[in-house]
């Protein structure tokens, strides 16, 4: 009988513990309040910091609490072009400037945004990786919905009340520089999670992987596998619609709703 393979060991098990060592905290927008719904609130960028395990830099933005005599520090994902000492405005009536936070319904079509809310008040879920951005495509005032194009290229209809940061996430072009040596990859993934180095299945023994074994490295069976396969066999191309090269050209007509 074979061993428990890598895919099974990584599956459901004990309670997940988040990797928090040296992390600076959760990067998200302000909790929506009366000031943001009806006007705007002003903050100042105090510092731009690096967060281990994250490609994009973070901005420490200090706001005055609208209800108590104190200051509150928020961690925003930094938009490209912001700087320390810059004023950041959050709210319905804020101006359309880089780094400001506005509802997407108030932005003109074609605006580039990042750290976009998927549902009103979730404080930013989409387009958060370094260099990523979403584009506002169109508005529907009757249904109060806005259509946006996500970094993947897919289009999504969201509420016009969802907030977003104006601009592109800083740190773009990070993956253009080659890693070049294993030592850099080691330190990169050590800060993220235990996923490196990744041994190929064909390089393993037969007890450790369905693709292991043989007098030379070959899979020896179809690499496609059905969706309901048992966990110890479910490796390779799982429930794929097609395999092989994409040959020829195909014209895709996009239907604009």
Swiss-Prot record:
Molecular functions per Gene Ontology: rRNA binding; structural constituent of ribosome
A cellular component annotation (GO) from this entry: cytosolic large ribosomal subunit
PTM annotation: Hydroxylated on His-216 by RIOX1. The modification is impaired by hypoxia.
Protease is among the record's keywords: no
Position(s), cross-link Glycyl lysine isopeptide (Lys-Gly) (interchain with G-Cter in SUMO2): 42, 149, 234, 250
SMART domains associated with the record: Ribosomal_L2, Ribosomal_L2_C
Compartments reported by the entry: Cytoplasm
Pfam families the record matches: Ribosomal_L2, Ribosomal_L2_C
Superkingdom classification of source: Eukaryota
Residues recorded with modification (3S)-3-hydroxyhistidine: 216
Keywords of the record: Cytoplasm, Hydroxylation, Isopeptide bond, Ribonucleoprotein, Ribosomal protein, RNA-binding, rRNA-binding, Ubl conjugation
GO biological process, one term: cytoplasmic translation
Chain segments carrying region Disordered: 207-231
Record note on quaternary structure: Component of the large ribosomal subunit. Interacts with CRY1.
NCBIfam families, per the entry: PRK09612.1 (NF007180)
The family this protein is said to belong to: Belongs to the universal ribosomal protein uL2 family.
Name of protein: Large ribosomal subunit protein uL2
Organism from which the protein derives: Pongo abelii (Sumatran orangutan)
Gene: RPL8
């Amino acid at each position: 009988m074979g061993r428990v393979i890598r895919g099974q060991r990584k599956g459901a098990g004990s309670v997940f513990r988040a990797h928090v060592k040296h992390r600076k905290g959760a990067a998200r927008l302000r909790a929506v309040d009366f000031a943001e719904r009806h006007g705007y609130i002003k903050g100042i960028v105090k510092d731009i910091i690096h967060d281990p395990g994250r490609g994009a830099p973070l901005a420490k933005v200090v706001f005055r609490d609208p209800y108590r005599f104190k200051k509150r520090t928020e961690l925003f994902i930094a938009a490209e072009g912001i700087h320390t000492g810059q004023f950041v405005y959050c709210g319905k009536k804020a101006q359309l400037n880089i780094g400001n936070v506005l509802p997407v319904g108030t932005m003109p079509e074609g605006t580039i945004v990042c750290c976009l809310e998927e549902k009103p008040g979730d404080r930013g879920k989409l387009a958060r990786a370094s260099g990523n951005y979403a584009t506002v495509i169109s508005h529907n005032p009757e249904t109060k919905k806005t259509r946006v194009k996500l970094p993947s290229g897919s289009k999504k209809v969201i509420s016009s009340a969802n907030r977003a940061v104006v601009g592109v996430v800083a740190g773009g072009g990070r993956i253009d520089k080659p890693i070049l040596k294993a030592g850099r990859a080691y330190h990169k993934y050590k800060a993220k999670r235990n996923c490196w180095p990744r041994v190929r299945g064909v390089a393993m023994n037969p007890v450790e992987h369905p693709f292991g074994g043989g007098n030379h490295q070959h899979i020896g069976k179809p690499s496609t596998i059905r969706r309901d396969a048992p966990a110890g066999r479910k490796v390779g191309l799982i429930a794929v619609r097609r395999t092989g090269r994409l040959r020829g050209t195909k014209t895709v007509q996009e239907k604009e709703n």
